[in-house]
Amino acid sequence: LLAVGASPIMADEVNEVTEIVSISQALLINIGTVNDRTAESMMLAGEKANELSIPIVLDPVGVGSTSYRRQLVQLLLKNIQFNLIRCNAGELAAIAGEVWQSKGVDSGTGEIDIALVAKRISLQYRCFVIVTGESDFITNGYEELHISGGKELATHITGTGCLLSAICAASLASGGTNQLQNLVTTLKDYKQAAEQNTKNVGDFALQFMNRLQELAEVEK
């Protein structure tokens, strides 16, 4: 996030999350390492962000893997108004109640009409939905766009999806009247940053971060 010009702070303590949200311009709720304590913090943070009209992004990491995660995400979506859900196809399927075979935090396997399901979820929860994969998909429930590009090596690095969610939160925090276009630009830049000729995962991760910084500098 620092590479793209954002200034992050990570907080999951119940006694401070509302204060942290109060001085923030966006909130990312990521359930990657969730437990009962952090689940309470997520709810408090989301409610405070809604109160202050601060944009919120949900990254439902591995939501289809366990009933605990599914129930938590359902509760979050019921009680918090999100601006964006950023997920992979498997996570989208779990949120929508579609049949899918999850594989940890990875997308897993299954067959759904991503565009149709994503648009339904977008309308149901009144937020943008981004589904990432070989081709990224974004919708506001009415408009939709596919973004291609990038390299398969990105799928071999843990955290690239979580990083994208954080950058999307920064994009929403930047304001502007056309949030959909801002998010589309973010997705295109992210794909472009992943278009490298490196063959090794370690080299790819390093060059990926360098490229993100370069793109951020160009857009200043």
PLM segments and residue spans:
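Conserved N-terminal subdomain of the carbohydrate kinase-like
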Residues: L2-L58
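Short pre-catalytic strand/loop immediately N-terminal to key active-site residues, enriched for Gly-Thr
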Residues: L145-T158
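Conserved phosphate/ATP/ADP-binding segment of small-molecule kinases
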Residues: R69-E144
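Charged C-terminal helix
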Residues: T186, Y190-K220
